[in-house]
């Protein structure tokens, strides 16, 4: 364990990256092979939010402007300028992916499949490079890759096994296109910053700080939770470094000033874009006012253990507090405390679980791995043979953990993915129709009504036509929360949904879909306690008000409401007919076009 190789042996990193990539792509591989010749080319959605990212990406591939709403069909134009959305502000990944997709003529579906492979492989190599530069041991770094990327979210398996809930974010770093696209960049930024601080050559230090500054700018326009994490982590790293390596203060301060210049240069235009966000953005994304401390998240608890372990080793003289590896580890361990408690000073909290799920768990796992290796090196408690066995067990356990997450991910999403794939031929037909307009323009006005919740979410991932309602319609600033609520009520009314005989004191008796609909009528995000630090359980009087709203909506529904928005297409499964007496009261259909397992009707409002 004491012997280290100063030269990075990339073959170990490549092997680890191949293992991670295989686990990452397994859900797609299984899905495609399980459908065999009946696979219609749909990507295997693995995380709940991927449909909104795929929809926005598909709109960009179609050549629509950066400020667009793929669900409503409303795009930015000189006549109707659109506000910024959280997707249009984080534009670098989708614009780059869309540009590449157009150049090589691939769809958003194929782009998502490719992104999984690219992200998994690149992230693994980034972790390997970072650990190899810290530990000076390529074999250990390769094992660390598996531990960090495949076991960081192992707690989700425990939650599943003990019946504490089924997570929606297994192997979360792979969620496309965010945080997947910026995840390896975040890791490389960390490595460059460490390289900047430890470089003995001015040329290397200068190159590192410039590279880190450029990557920070990329993060700023890629993913909010990554660039804000980078800022806090940089402050922690710089603060600890300056405190324990005082003899380097002048040199380090100069480098940090250069980095700060890059940060300010990137932040200035970013905050201009932020100032142009829609008025409902904060509410739509569950911005909460709170000064309440948040001290008991898993990453924070592990952070305490890591700091205690480092403190123990320093007190025993096994490591020095001034060692770069120790400083790096401490910075990773301390950062979550600042991130999860910044609201004590700012009074604002924005879905902080994203820090834990999409970056904090990985940097904490990385710090834990480094701390354990430092402990092992400082206290030679086992023979080299036993050490090799233990490390093999760590690697095997990590692969097993990642495989278990991939399996749970596949199992959870399989029914919905099958529906998406069955509907794909009809969605491709819609996309074809949208390009057959008289003036040659793309049809982004003809609204599609798909009563199936999953199909409604999937239409915009392939076709440019807007939809009556979809779960993520409300996150775009052109749609107010009231409009979203009305469109949801129309969506439910058309397919004859009623909430009769619902016990407002026993909502747990509802199935997941009904529960989602009802909670959304009460208020967006009320179904998920993780979305806001101020979340409160739904009260009986709120249920009563929502039911009254829906009953009144149904009772007063008229032709004016039926035309808001005007529906042009109806998409139904041929194998699972839905009662649509309310829809047929207001719209008349043509004979329908059979496309695969679906029927596409052209409809018009009755006179």
Language-model region placement:
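Extracytoplasmic
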Residues: 57, 388-482
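Start-transfer (signal-anchor) and selected internal transmembrane alpha helices
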Residues: 1-34, 390, 607
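Signature aromatic-anchored transmembrane alpha helix within multi-pass, membrane-resident enzymes
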Residues: 257-264, 375-406
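Hydrophobic/aromatic-rich transmembrane helices and adjacent perimembrane loops
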Residues: 228-233, 349-380
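Luminal/periplasmic acceptor-recognition loop/helix of membrane-associated glycosyltransferases
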Residues: 466-570
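Membrane-interface alpha helices of multi-pass inner-membrane proteins
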Residues: 190-192, 207-224
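Transmembrane catalytic cores of multi-pass membrane glycosyltransferases
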Residues: 49, 215-341, 345-352
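Active-site lumenal/periplasmic loops and adjacent helix-entry segments of GT-C-fold
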Residues: 22-185, 224-228, 407-417
